């Protein structure tokens, strides 16, 4: 009887160990789960596990779109051109975003610790490569070139 009881306790301990370790593995895999992915104009697939929280925009067109579609708290910086009422349709809305960046200034962009940088397709591909090499997700968007 003592041997049976000892074997049952050992079996129960092994089962508890397996159950507890199985829970830990599942929780770890959920953390790295991809919620959605997007493909930019260069064909690069960008995967997101959650909505970006610190977006930097590198073009006035993307400034205008972001300010209309995204909560201001999720925008870390816009281009300095967004303040110019002569060329920006969102110069007043842009005032709530404090951060400003200029073209191809890697250090300034990195200082905002972005989780996404939105870049127009006319910007240099070398600069996009530098951003990606720094571990930043970069979405390159197509820029319209006609009114049609």
Summary of predicted features, one role per range:
Residues 1-11:
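Bacterial N-terminal signal peptides that target proteins for export
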Residues 10-20:
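Bacterial N-terminal signal peptides
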Residues 25, 34-35, 45, 116, ...:
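Extracytoplasmic substrate-binding proteins
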Residues 32, 69-71, 132:
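Short, structurally constrained coil/turn elements
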Residues 57-112, 116-121, 127:
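A short, structured surface patch at a secondary-structure boundary
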